[in-house]
A protein has these predicted regions:
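Conserved thiamine diphosphate
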Residues: 1-25
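Short beta-strand segments
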Residues: 8-10, 32-34, 72
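Glycine-/acidic-rich phosphate or pyrophosphate-binding loops and their flanking alpha/beta elements
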Residues: 17-28, 37-82
Length: 82
Protein backbone atom coordinates (compact mmCIF):
# COMPACT_ATOMS: atom_id res chain seq x y z
CA UNK A 1 0.00 0.00 0.00
CA UNK A 2 1.69 3.23 -1.09
CA UNK A 3 2.35 5.70 1.70
CA UNK A 4 1.72 3.19 4.51
CA UNK A 5 3.73 3.94 7.65
CA UNK A 6 4.29 1.67 10.65
CA UNK A 7 5.23 3.01 14.09
CA UNK A 8 6.21 0.99 17.16
CA UNK A 9 6.63 3.05 20.35
CA UNK A 10 8.99 2.04 23.14
CA UNK A 11 7.98 4.28 26.06
CA UNK A 12 5.28 6.77 27.08
CA UNK A 13 7.08 9.62 25.33
CA UNK A 14 7.13 7.68 22.06
CA UNK A 15 3.48 6.66 22.48
CA UNK A 16 2.24 10.19 22.99
CA UNK A 17 4.38 11.81 20.31
CA UNK A 18 3.91 9.14 17.66
CA UNK A 19 0.16 8.78 18.24
CA UNK A 20 -0.36 12.50 17.72
CA UNK A 21 1.85 12.43 14.63
CA UNK A 22 -0.07 9.39 13.32
CA UNK A 23 -3.42 11.13 13.74
CA UNK A 24 -2.18 14.21 11.91
CA UNK A 25 -0.54 12.27 9.06
CA UNK A 26 -2.30 12.33 5.70
CA UNK A 27 -1.20 8.77 4.87
CA UNK A 28 -2.36 5.56 6.59
CA UNK A 29 -0.40 4.67 9.73
CA UNK A 30 -0.28 1.33 11.54
CA UNK A 31 0.35 1.98 15.25
CA UNK A 32 1.77 -1.15 16.92
CA UNK A 33 0.91 -1.22 20.60
CA UNK A 34 2.61 -3.93 22.67
CA UNK A 35 0.36 -5.08 25.52
CA UNK A 36 3.39 -6.51 27.34
CA UNK A 37 4.48 -2.90 27.92
CA UNK A 38 1.35 -2.09 29.95
CA UNK A 39 2.25 -1.48 33.58
CA UNK A 40 5.94 -0.79 32.93
CA UNK A 41 6.97 2.51 34.48
CA UNK A 42 9.08 5.07 32.65
CA UNK A 43 10.53 8.40 33.68
CA UNK A 44 8.34 11.16 32.27
CA UNK A 45 9.84 14.33 30.86
CA UNK A 46 7.47 17.28 31.46
CA UNK A 47 7.93 18.34 27.81
CA UNK A 48 5.57 15.56 26.68
CA UNK A 49 2.66 17.31 28.41
CA UNK A 50 2.89 20.18 25.91
CA UNK A 51 -0.16 20.15 23.62
CA UNK A 52 2.07 20.43 20.56
CA UNK A 53 4.52 17.66 21.51
CA UNK A 54 5.12 15.39 18.49
CA UNK A 55 7.69 12.85 17.44
CA UNK A 56 8.10 13.01 13.67
CA UNK A 57 7.36 9.76 11.87
CA UNK A 58 10.36 8.46 9.94
CA UNK A 59 13.07 9.75 12.28
CA UNK A 60 15.10 7.27 14.32
CA UNK A 61 15.54 7.97 18.01
CA UNK A 62 18.97 7.59 19.62
CA UNK A 63 18.42 6.15 23.10
CA UNK A 64 22.10 5.91 24.03
CA UNK A 65 24.73 7.62 21.85
CA UNK A 66 27.99 5.85 21.13
CA UNK A 67 30.69 5.35 18.51
CA UNK A 68 31.43 1.60 18.36
CA UNK A 69 28.24 -0.22 17.37
CA UNK A 70 24.70 0.41 16.17
CA UNK A 71 21.84 -1.70 17.51
CA UNK A 72 18.35 -1.30 16.14
CA UNK A 73 15.28 -2.56 17.98
CA UNK A 74 11.62 -1.75 18.43
CA UNK A 75 9.01 -1.99 21.18
CA UNK A 76 10.02 -4.09 24.20
CA UNK A 77 13.35 -5.15 22.69
CA UNK A 78 14.65 -1.58 23.09
CA UNK A 79 14.84 -2.15 26.83
CA UNK A 80 16.64 -5.46 26.39
CA UNK A 81 19.14 -3.99 23.92
CA UNK A 82 20.04 -1.09 26.22
Amino acid sequence: MPGLKVVSPWNIEDCRGLLKASIRDNDPVVFLENEMMYGIEFDVDPKIMDKEFLIPIGKAKIERPGTDVTITAHAKMVGHSL
